[in-house]
C-alpha cells in the first residue's frame, strides 16, 4: 500500500482519490470541541477532546476540557479519571484541581473535595487567574455539605441513644412494678400497693421527661449551628471578622481583599471592576451583626 500512515498534521487522500486532505490537528480538534461545548453539545464536545487526546496525550488541558463535559453530563467517574490524568501532566493546573473538587463534591467525598478546591483557589491566586466567585462558591458548598453530613451522623447517634435510654427506663419501670406486685401478693388492702405503684410511675415519668428535655435542648442548639452565607467572606469562605464594602456593593473580609489587591491585582474579585485599597469602606452594620452572631454562638470557631 502506497503512502505513509496517517499522523497528526499529516495528510490523507480525499474520497475521490484526488488531492490530499489535511487531517485536523489536536489543537484544531480542541477548538472544535470548544465550539460544541459553547453550544451545550457536551457528548460531541467530549468526543472531540477525546480525539485531541488520541492525537496528543500529553496536553493537560484536553483532559480538563473533557472532564468538564463529563461533569455537565454527570459522569463523575470519567471526569475524576480525566482530572487525575491532567494533574499527572500538570500538577499546577487550577482547572484540574477545581473540576476534581467538583467531582468529589458530587460523589460526597467532602474532605477530598475541600482539599482540592482550596488547592485550586491557592493556585489561582499564585498564578493571578481570576475565576470570580466560582471556586469560592464551590468551596462554601463543600464545607456546608460536610458540616451537614457530620450533623446528620450526630442526629442519628443521638436518636439511637434516646431510643436506648427510653427502653432502659421503660424496662426498669416494669421491673419495679412487678417487684412491688410480688412483694404485696395476698395483701387484703391493696391501697398501699397502688400508692407505691403510682410513685414508681411518677418517678419514671419524670426520668423520661427530664431526658426528653435534655435531648430537646441539644437539638435546639444543633439547629442553630449554621453560619448564614451573608456573614461569610467571598474570598476566604469563613465568617468575616473585619467586613468592608467596595464601590460595587460587595462586602469582603478586609485581610482577604487587601491580600487579593496586593497579590492578584487591583480589581474587585467578583465584579472585576477596578478597585484600590483606599476605596474599601468599613461595613459597620455588618460588623455589628457578626459580633452579635458570635456572642450567641460559641461553636462558631469550630465550624
Curated annotation (Swiss-Prot):
Chain spans, region Required for interaction with and ubiquitination of MYOCD: 142-196
Stretches of the chain forming a coiled coil according to its record: none
Alphabetized GO MF terms: enzyme binding; G protein-coupled receptor binding; heat shock protein binding; Hsp70 protein binding; Hsp90 protein binding; kinase binding; misfolded protein binding; protein homodimerization activity
Pathway assigned in UniProt: Protein modification; protein ubiquitination
Region Required for ubiquitination of FOXO1, annotated ranges: 143-303
Cross-link (Glycyl lysine isopeptide (Lys-Gly) (interchain with G-Cter in ubiquitin)): 2, 22, 221, 255
Reaction equations catalysed: S-ubiquitinyl-[E2 ubiquitin-conjugating enzyme]-L-cysteine + [acceptor protein]-L-lysine = [E2 ubiquitin-conjugating enzyme]-L-cysteine + N(6)-ubiquitinyl-[acceptor protein]-L-lysine
Subcellular locations according to the entry: Cytoplasm; Nucleus; Mitochondrion
Composition bias type Basic and acidic residues, residue spans: 1-10
Required for interaction with FOXO1: region residues: 143-197
Subunit structure and binding partners: Homodimer. Interacts with BAG2. Interacts with E2 ubiquitin conjugating enzymes UBE2D1, UBE2D2 and UBE2D3. Detected in a ternary complex containing STUB1, HSPA1A and HSPBP1. Part of a complex composed of STUB1/CHIP, VCP/p97, CHRNA3, and UBXN2A that modulates the ubiquitination and endoplasmic reticulum-associated degradation (ERAD) of CHRNA3. Within the complex UBXN2A acts as a scaffold protein required for the interaction of CHRNA3 with VCP/p97, this interaction also inhibits CHRNA3 ubiquitination by STUB1/CHIP and subsequently ERAD. Interacts with MKKS. Interacts with DNAAF4.
Role according to the record: E3 ubiquitin-protein ligase which targets misfolded chaperone substrates towards proteasomal degradation. Plays a role in the maintenance of mitochondrial morphology and promotes mitophagic removal of dysfunctional mitochondria; thereby acts as a protector against apoptosis in response to cellular stress. Negatively regulates vascular smooth muscle contraction, via degradation of the transcriptional activator MYOCD and subsequent loss of transcription of genes involved in vascular smooth muscle contraction.
Protein name: E3 ubiquitin-protein ligase CHIP
Biological source species: Homo sapiens (Human)
Amino acid at each position: 500500500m502506497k503512502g505513509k500512515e496517517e499522523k497528526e498534521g499529516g495528510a490523507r487522500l480525499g474520497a475521490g482519490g484526488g488531492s490530499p486532505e489535511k487531517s485536523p490537528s489536536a489543537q484544531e480538534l480542541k477548538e472544535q470541541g470548544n465550539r460544541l461545548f459553547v453550544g451545550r453539545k457536551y457528548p460531541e464536545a467530549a468526543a472531540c477532546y477525546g480525539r485531541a487526546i488520541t492525537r496528543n496525550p500529553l496536553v493537560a488541558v484536553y483532559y480538563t476540557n473533557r472532564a468538564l463535559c463529563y461533569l455537565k453530563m454527570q459522569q463523575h467517574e470519567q471526569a475524576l479519571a480525566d482530572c487525575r490524568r491532567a494533574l499527572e501532566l500538570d500538577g499546577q493546573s487550577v482547572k484540574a484541581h477545581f473540576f476534581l473538587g467538583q467531582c468529589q463534591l458530587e460523589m460526597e467525598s467532602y474532605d477530598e473535595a475541600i482539599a482540592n478546591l482550596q488547592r485550586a483557589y491557592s493556585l489561582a491566586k499564585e498564578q493571578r487567574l481570576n475565576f470570580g466567585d466560582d471556586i469560592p462558591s464551590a468551596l462554601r458548598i463543600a464545607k456546608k455539605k460536610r458540616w451537614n453530613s457530620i450533623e446528620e451522623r450526630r442526629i442519628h447517634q443521638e436518636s439511637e441513644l434516646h431510643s436506648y435510654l427510653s427502653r432502659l427506663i421503660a424496662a426498669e419501670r416494669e421491673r419495679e412494678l412487678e417487684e412491688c406486685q410480688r412483694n404485696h401478693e395476698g395483701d387484703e388492702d391493696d391501697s398501699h400497693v397502688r400508692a407505691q405503684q403510682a410513685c414508681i410511675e411518677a418517678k419514671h415519668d419524670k426520668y423520661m421527661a427530664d431526658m426528653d428535655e435534655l435531648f430537646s435542648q441539644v437539638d435546639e442548639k444543633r439547629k442553630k449551628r449554621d453560619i448564614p452565607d451573608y456573614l461569610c467572606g467571598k474570598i476566604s469562605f469563613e465568617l468575616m471578622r473585619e467586613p468592608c464594602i467596595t464601590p460595587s456593593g460587595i462586602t469582603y473580609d478586609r485581610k482577604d481583599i487587601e491580600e487579593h489587591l496586593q497579590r492578584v491585582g487591583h480589581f474587585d474579585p467578583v465584579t472585576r471592576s477596578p478597585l484600590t485599597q483606599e476605596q474599601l469602606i468599613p461595613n459597620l452594620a455588618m460588623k455589628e451583626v457578626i459580633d452579635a452572631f458570635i456572642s450567641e454562638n460559641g461553636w462558631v470557631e469550630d465550624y
